[in-house]
Curated annotation (Swiss-Prot):
Cleavable signal peptide: none
Top-rank taxon: Bacteria
Organism: Haemophilus ducreyi (strain 35000HP / ATCC 700724)
Family of the protein in this entry: Belongs to the methylthiotransferase family. RimO subfamily.
Residue pairs linked by disulfide bridges in the UniProt entry: none
Residue positions binding [4Fe-4S] cluster 1: C14, C50, C79
Name this protein carries in UniProt: Ribosomal protein uS12 methylthiotransferase RimO
BP GO annotations: tRNA modification
GO terms, molecular function: 4 iron, 4 sulfur cluster binding; aspartic acid methylthiotransferase activity; metal ion binding; protein methylthiotransferase activity
SUPFAM superfamilies registered for this protein in UniProt: Radical SAM enzymes
């Protein structure tokens, strides 16, 4: 074995899982291991899995199988790791299996099979912000783990546990390190961002703590107010529509955090929402959306929905289409209901046939596409702040405040010299054209 052991790493799943991968990679680098992006020459391979839906489980199992075939020494972690028996039935030769956010256990297993190397102070230095898998100009910041909801289509609590919020000072310290390292955009993630600190006692929630000499309370609003002082873009994801979310909108209107709200509404039929164990009155939701836009006209609303949930009738589905038309959401994701092993909804009666799910999915997307086209057309002629993600011989590709990386649209700018700008720079672009999802503009 060479002086510095090589660890191969595969990261699957959502941004929350990506943050877990970054934490493990940071621990590996701190311990002196070399991280490589291939099976060849790796002394061990770690696979951080996803287990949210059956297709993700299959992808994870295939990734583990490939790692075993190409390398032979594999440690499995992540959401699917919570189902050890399921993994070992398919891949009995896996060395060790841990559940999600089991950083210490993963490192113990690595040390067991690949002893920790002697540290060289000149080669094993880890940047203050840790190892990041995202481009240097943006990063995901996870503020809590787990979830207290018991949605019938979801098994996240069984894999990641109940809500466990990080201390606010710890979050803010990490955010400042990231900003100091050059990060221009922080994407705040968790299973339920708006529930931040609600798992703590009222005494702890109301307790005054100090950060940078400023007294703050332990809640989401205070967290956002302090993140705003960093002078970078702050984007909120996975914001469950609790009443106190209304208090975030003035911060967006004042330019303290991005006017972008990612709220997973899931459906519009009261019957289906009840079956999903999701709260909320659609009439009240529409009223709140109207109020939010009155306070913050530039607000971008993103949401996700499920079609073909067990018991969904044509009438239920039509309610969803009517809601889309009335709500005029900016960015929307749609998923066909997928059975998940262990989820209550998987065993429900009145399962919707696959061909019906497919047909409803396409109808849903047609309605939302028309809405998206109309809303993006309204941006033509406006000048928007754009953060640059890529620069090539054709121009630049960036994102506006309305666009999160990977899941939303982009802005193309071609009348600009490569030497005039840098990746991560925020520039002003005048929009000249739009299609269903993307914008074009001039600098």
């Amino acid at each position: 074995m060479r002086d510095v052991p090589n660890i191969g790493f595969i990261s699957l799943g959502c941004p929350k899982n990506l943050v877990d991968s970054e934490r493990i990679l940071t621990e590996l680098r701190s311990d002196g291991y070399n991280i490589i992006p291939s099976y060849e020459n790796a002394d061990l391979v770690i696979v951080n899995t996803c287990g949210f839906i059956d297709s993700a489980v299959q992808e994870s199992l295939e990734a583990v199988g490939e790692a075993l075939k190409e390398n032979g020494k594999v440690i499995v972690t992540g959401c699917l790791g919570a189902k050890e028996n399921q993994i070992r039935e398919v891949h009995p030769k896996v060395l060790e299996i841990t559940g999600p956010h089991s950083y210490e256990a993963v490192m113990q297993h690595v040390h067991k099979y690949v002893p920790r190397p002697e540290r060289n102070m000149y080669t094993s230095l880890v940047p203050a912000q840790g190892v990041k898998l995202t481009p240097k100009h943006y990063a995901y910041l996870k503020i809590s783990e787990g979830c207290d909801h018991r949605c019938t289509f979801c098994i996240i609590p069984s894999m990641r546990g109940d809500l466990d919020s990080r201390p606010i000072v710890q979050i803010l310290d990490e955010a400042k390190r990231l900003a100091d390292s050059g990060v221009k955009e922080l994407l705040i993630v968790s299973q339920d961002t708006s529930a931040y600190a609600l798992d703590q006692t009222k005494e702890n929630q109301n307790k005054t703590v100090f950060w940078n000499g400023v007294p703050i309370k332990n809640n989401l609003i205070s967290l956002c107010e302090q993140l705003a002082t960093l002078g970078i873009w702050i984007r909120l994801h996975y914001v469950y529509p609790y009443p106190h979310v209304d208090n975030l909108i003035p911060l967006m209107a004042e330019g303290k955090i991005l006017p972008y709200l990612d709220i997973p509404l899931q459906h519009a039929s009261p019957k289906i929402l009840k079956a999903m164990k999701r709260p909320g009155s659609i009439d009240r939701t529409l009223e709140r959306i109207k109020q939010w836009r009155e306070i913050c006209p530039e607000l971008t609303l993103r949401s996700t929905f499920i079609v073909g949930f067990p018991g969904e009738t044509e009438e239920d589905f039509q309610m969803l289409l009517d809601f889309l038309t009335e709500a005029q959401l900016d960015r929307v994701g749609c998923f066909k209901f997928s059975p998940v092993d262990g989820a209550v909804a998987t065993e429900m009666a009145e399962q919707v046939p696959e061909e019906v799910k497919e047909e409803r999915f396409h109808r849903f997307m047609q309605v939302q596409q028309r809405i998206s086209v109309a809303r993006l057309q309204q941006k033509i002629g406006k000048t928007l702040a754009i953060i640059i993600d890529e620069i090539d011989e054709y121009g630049i590709i960036g994102r506006s405040m309305a666009d999160a990386p990977e899941i939303d649209g982009v802005v193309y700018v071609d009348n600009i010299s490569q030497q005039a700008v840098t990746v991560g720079q925020i520039i002003l672009v005048t929009i000249t054209n739009a299609d269903e999802y993307d914008l074009w503009g001039t600098y």
